[in-house]
C-alpha cells in the first residue's frame, strides 16, 4: 500500500536554529508514497459558504482556449456498507465501511489523553446527523509490541501529535487524493 523513506539531511544555514559553530542544520525527514484507491471518489465542487478544505486545479482543456481554476472539496470517504443501504435509506444510523481513526501520540501527557480522545469522539454527533454512527474514533497509538507496522510518520495513520511549543495553536494538514479530494490521512 505504501513505501516509507526516512533520511537525515544536513544543510548549510547561517541563522538559528543552525549550529552556529558549523553553519549547518541537520534534519531527519520522512517521506511517504502511497498507492491511491483503485476507484476514486466522485469529486464534489467547493462551495464558498461551507468552511472546509478545498483543492484548486487549473483546467486547461476548455474549448475557448483559456484556463479556469476550479475548486474541489477535500473530504473523507464515508460509504454505507452494502448490507445497510436499506437501513440508511429509512433514516437509520449505520456504520461506515471504513471508520475515520485518529491515533493519539504516545508522547502526549497522560493526563490529557482521555480529553483528546473524547474531543475526537465528540464529532460523532456531526456524523450521526449525516446518518453514520461510530464514523470517527480516537484511540491511543499502539505500542511497537501491539502493532510493529505502526509509525506516526506512516501516511496510512491519522495522528494527533504532541509537540511542546510556546505557540498556542494547532495545525491539521492532510493528504488527499488529487483526483477526487478524498482525505487519506490527517495529522493534528
What do the PLM-derived regions correspond to, one by one?
Residues 114-121, 125:
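Solvent-exposed, polar/charged alpha-helical surfaces in well-ordered, non-transmembrane soluble domains
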Residues 109-113:
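Alpha-helix N-cap/helix-initiation motif
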Amino acid at each position: 500500500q505504501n513505501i516509507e523513506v526516512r533520511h537525515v539531511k544536513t544543510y548549510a544555514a547561517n541563522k538559528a536554529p543552525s549550529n552556529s559553530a558549523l553553519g549547518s542544520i541537520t534534519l531527519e525527514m520522512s517521506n511517504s508514497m502511497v498507492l491511491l484507491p483503485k476507484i476514486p471518489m466522485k469529486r464534489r465542487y467547493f462551495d464558498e459558504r461551507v468552511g472546509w478544505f478545498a483543492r484548486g486545479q487549473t483546467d486547461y482543456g476548455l474549448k475557448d482556449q483559456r484556463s479556469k481554476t476550479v475548486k474541489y472539496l477535500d473530504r473523507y470517504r464515508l460509504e454505507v456498507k452494502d448490507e445497510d443501504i436499506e437501513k440508511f435509506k429509512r433514516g437509520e444510523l449505520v456504520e461506515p465501511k471504513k471508520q475515520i481513526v485518529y491515533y493519539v501520540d504516545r508522547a502526549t501527557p497522560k493526563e490529557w489523553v482521555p480529553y483528546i480522545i473524547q474531543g475526537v469522539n465528540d464529532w460523532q454527533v456531526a456524523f450521526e446527523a449525516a446518518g453514520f454512527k461510530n464514523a470517527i474514533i480516537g484511540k491511543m497509538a499502539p505500542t511497537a509490541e501491539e502493532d510493529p507496522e505502526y509509525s506516526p510518520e506512516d501516511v496510512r495513520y491519522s495522528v494527533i501529535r504532541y509537540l511542546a511549543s510556546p505557540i498556542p495553536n494547532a495545525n491539521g494538514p492532510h493528504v488527499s487524493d488529487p483526483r477526487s479530494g478524498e482525505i487519506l490521512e490527517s495529522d493534528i
